[in-house]
Each structure stands twice: as C-alpha cells, then as structure tokens.
Amino acid sequence: FANDDELLDYIQKTHFNYMWEGAEKTSGLACERIHLDNVYPQQDQDVITIGGSGFGIAGLLVAIERNFINREEGVARLTKIVDYLAKADRFHGVWPHWLHGPTGKVKPFGTKDDGGDLVESSFLMQSLLCVRQYVKDGNEKEKALAAKIDELWHGMEFDWYRNGDQNVLYWHWSPNYGWEMNFPLEGYNECLIT
C-alpha cells in the first residue's frame, strides 16, 4: 500500500464486502464461515453467526459513511436484517449463538447450547443500537427501522438471564437443558459487552 489511507480503505472495504457480498441470502446477516472453494464438508454454508453479524452491521454504517454504498441501499439491507431477526428464534428475547439462515431456527453451537446466548446477542444488539441512533431522525423508512430495533431491544429479557433472583447474568439458557451450562458472566473477557 502506498500510504495508510489506502490500507484503511482496503481493510474497511474488505470487512464491508464480507457482510455485503458474502451475507447469507435470506437474512442479510454474516455467515459463520465462507469457504472460497465452496466446499462445505459439514453442510454449514447457511449458518449465521449472531455475534459476528453485530460486527458486520457496524461495518454497514461505516460503508454508508465512506460511500461504499448509498444510504438507501444500507437502510434497505438493515431493514431486511431487522425484519429477519424479529421472526428468528429467540429465547426470552435473546438469539442463539447460531441460526440456520433459510429458516431462522436455532443451529446448536454445542450439545447443551441450543437456546439463548446473551453475550453473542449483546454484540448484535450493540450494533443495532448504533443503527438506531444513526437512523432515528431520518426519513419515514429510517424512523420505522429505528422503531423495529427498539422492539427487539426492549424484548431482550436480561432479568430472565439472572436464573431467578441471582445477582449475576448467565451466558446461556436452553429450552431443553435450562441452566445446565451454568456460566455466570464475570471476569475481564468478552462478556463485559453485556
């Protein structure tokens, strides 16, 4: 790269393109992985990453500001994403770690990890709240998008993830295994986002 600006352009465009061109088709969200050879031995090409989608959504805002796409294109994609998320599996308002893209149904991350994932959902919601702030004073489509995000945000039952009246949030809850993963959010790690 000739200079830092070229490097920054390259990094931002590449990040944006993963979410724009590489997105799962039904949802517009980030795929868990993309194999450039299009060979998926585990048949997981349609798996959506909830936390990774949060990072990708933030990248869409950068893409609008950098004129990689226009605002109308960005709002259309973000509306598609939010509409999909409103219909996808949620567990007390919280999405699972992974979703099966075409159906919006949970794709278990592990044996007992087939329900709500509070930390991954927090990565997603952090970016959705950035989108909300970005569009809340815009045109009617943008205001409608902000209102939909408010519904999703207010639907997240953080108090449920206290496992009763415990004074801590828990990472996972499963409709099949309840609180068996028993992972309280504590320490200096990715759970601080929650």
Can you annotate each of these PLM segments?
Residues 1-7, 17-18, 54-69, 84, ...:
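Well-ordered alpha-helical scaffold segments within catalytic/enzyme domains
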Residues 27-32, 68-74, 138-145:
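Surface-exposed patches in mature extracellular/periplasmic domains of secreted proteins
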Residues 12-28, 76-93, 147-167:
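Long, well-ordered core segments of solenoidal/helical folds
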Residues 1-45, 92-94:
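Low-complexity, Ser/Thr/Pro/Gly-enriched N-terminal "stalk/linker" regions
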Residues 5-7, 93-122, 137-194:
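Extended ligand-binding clefts on enzyme/binding-domain cores
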Residues 23-30, 57-60, 64, 182:
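Short amphipathic alpha-helical segments enriched in hydrophobics
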Residues 45-54, 58-113:
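Membrane helical hairpin/interfacial module
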Residues 2, 6, 10-13, 47-54, ...:
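Soluble non-cytosolic domains of exported or imported proteins
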